[in-house]
Regions:
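Cytochrome P450 fold signature focused on the C-terminal beta-domain
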Residues: 18-28
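Conserved C-terminal structural/oligomerization subdomain of aldehyde/semialdehyde dehydrogenase
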Residues: 28, 32-149
Length: 149
């Protein structure tokens, strides 16, 4: 995973994203192990690989937008859909946007997601759910029977 994240950070630099913090290599004082520098990119275009890939590391890609609809379009324009994050004081906006996001989970204002709610993604981020009633359904077998009146 460390090597994959390093490759993606390098790709972000090579594709022209502006490196704001972090970058390649390990954090000072954490040379042992597989630690990655927390990395922030600005001026990211949604066509860049760092915007289109689930990195699973401490890498943030900042993509500017003008309107709510544009933000939703950018967020949904990826083959993945594990989770999204919304930061707003407007609860109606949070509900409206969350409904339009194509991801298995949406975190609003850092509240986190309850441990007993279904966990899983959309698109290439996996199928099925873990936890909650939907997680239990993964262990059930459904049978259809026909032929009597």
């Amino acid at each position: 995973q460390f090597n994959k994240i390093q490759t993606l950070i390098k790709k972000g630099i090579d594709e022209g994203a502006k490196l704001i913090a972090g970058g390649l290599g390990k954090p000072v004082g954490l040379e042992k192990g597989y630690f990655v520098k927390p990395t922030v990119f600005a001026d990211v275009d949604n066509k860049m690989e760092i915007a289109r890939t689930e990195i699973f590391g401490p890498v943030l890609s900042v993509i500017p937008f003008e309107t709510e609809d544009e933000a939703i379009k950018i967020a949904n324009d990826t083959p993945y859909g594990l989770t999204n994050y919304i930061q707003t004081k407007d609860q109606e906006k949070a509900k409206r946007v969350a409904k339009k996001l194509r991801s298995g989970m949406v975190d609003v204002n850092g509240a986190g997601i309850a441990i007993d709610t279904p966990f899983g993604g959309f698109k290439h981020s996996g199928i099925g759910r873990e936890a909650g009633e939907h997680g239990l359904q993964e262990f059930l077998e459904v049978k259809s029977v026909g032929g009597w009146n």
